[in-house]
Amino acid sequence: MEKLSTAASLFGVVVAATALAMAVVGGEAAVVEQTFMVHEMNVTHLCNTTKIYVVNGRFPGPTVDVTEGDTVVVHVINRLPHGLTIHWHGVRQMRSCWADGAGYVTECPIHPGGEKTYRFNVTGQVGTLWWHAHVTCLRATINGAFIIRPRDGKYPFPTPAKDVPIIIGEWWELDLIELDRRMLDGNFDDNPLSATINGKLGDLSNCSGTVEESFVLDVKRGESYLLRVINTALFSEYYFKVAGHTFTVVGADGNYLTPYKTDMVTVAPGEAIDVLMFADAPPAYYHMVALANQPPPPDLQIPQLTSRGLVRYTGAAMDSNNLPMPMPVMPDQHNTMPSYYFRRNLTGLALPEQQQRHRVPAHVDERLLITLGLGSICRGGNTTTCKRGRSPETVVVATMNNVSFHHTNATALLEHYYDGTPEGVYTEDFPVRPPRPFNYTDRELIPAGPLEAALEPTAKAMRLRRFRYNASVEIVFQSTTLLQSDSNPMHLHGYDVFVLAQGLGNFDPKRDVEKFNYHNPQLRNTVQVPRGGWAAVRFLTDNPGMWYLHCHFEFHIIMGMATAFIVEDGPTPETSLPPPPPEFKRCGTNGLSQP
């Protein structure tokens, strides 16, 4: 983690910058309280000074460290010239949708100079989640780990000597607000300069012969370490390896997994993967590497992004005897198959007290097939008659079932829903299937041409989907090759979903339903839909409110690969969305300025 020393005076008066646990008696639940001061800071990397946005003078930001059952209270003070919200990524927010922190979906941004208190409970979840800004591209630097520890202190795996967040991100020299504006206008020529591990660029990056600082993990031979690997990047999925070591994957997205041994972890934007690493190598220095993968040409290409850190054994000397330090052998950056096979090998692990929560709904009330890809809308208000195929007459947008989400910059959708005022704001007719079937994974559709041009026209609208309380919903996400062949990390706020199966090619219900895992599927809040493939998920709508569904590639969400699910109230007050809490500021009092 990079601490910015020039911020010291700013925080001299902030006494609540670290967690305050109150009234913990006999293992009872506590109130864990923190203050997030959000501000600008100048940081120098690669011989250039860049203005970034941080919390409490740190990049990444402070860790929220709680125990299952605790109440979390975070006071956010916005010293930025832009509005922002904080999203608690993966927290179920049972009956606390008002605290989800999705900008313009559950709340309006905290205006410059404003404050907001988030208050919610973390019941029934254990493991690694994270938090991040949820307005524009600010999450690139406004983010941090969110750790939920078991109430009884016991794990279904050997207790590690230490646990360490490994936060993979990206270093952007361009101002993040300007980056957002460019992408909104269809300009995707900007790229990060480097990957980062816990805010460090690593010694592969240098300027004028001066190498960048690397993240260093100190270990003692014979001990095990729980690495909480989180991908906060805007653009890329990452491969992560440590030379001379193997991992045992034990959890993901705040849920336990059946232990799975591997020498490499793949983590997509939005995901959090828990792995045990046993320090059993000869004492020395070993490189850890985070390498971004990307589809091969003809997809648009970005520069290779890599960050390199170190695992340093106690007693190991940095001298000529252990140089060069061992390097892990990484896959080719264009080989995305290791990502697919890594996820196919993961299964869920339900503890005895979790059996009910881990029971897959046997029946299905609603089925959706959602295609994920690119399309275009005409510039200048011309709705249909414009030249397609990456023409300057069009803006390229991201779509779900040929609908590109029209992001609002006015009153939050949750307020409209709660007040019963959706007219003229949103409709509830998000399509349950694409408007017309085609060969979704035909690589001939990647380059612009007449084949894909006929499929480009897209509706720009705010079309949501409503579900009754306690309905069983099955979604098949289908990646397409329209103008690109990216994977798609799909994140559903307020829910964990059972990942029943993943596959390559076009989903075929006659063939692929037989592959569904009803016995021990993963529970995830972010599902990586493979490049040129599909993922099938199922969940029970047991959490009333307005819940954002979107791809976690930032360029996809800005381009419109999103919608929201409305879950109706249940039959009792305990199964209904409560009124907004006293600390919730309605949009009229919270500021409406779009950053």
Curated annotation (Swiss-Prot):
It comes from the Eukaryota. Binds 4 Cu cations per monomer. Its EC number is 1.10.3.2. One of its GO terms (biological process) is lignin catabolic process. It is found in: Secreted, Extracellular space, Apoplast. Residues 37-153, 162-316, 429-571 form the Plastocyanin-like domain. Cu cation 4 binds at residues 488, 551, 556, 561. Its cofactor is Cu cation. Cu cation 2 binds at residues 89, 132, 552. Keywords: Apoplast, Copper, Glycoprotein, Lignin degradation, Metal-binding, Oxidoreductase, Repeat, Secreted, Signal. PANTHER family: LACCASE-18, MULTI-COPPER OXIDASE. NCBIfam families: laccase. This is Putative laccase-18. The gene is LAC18.
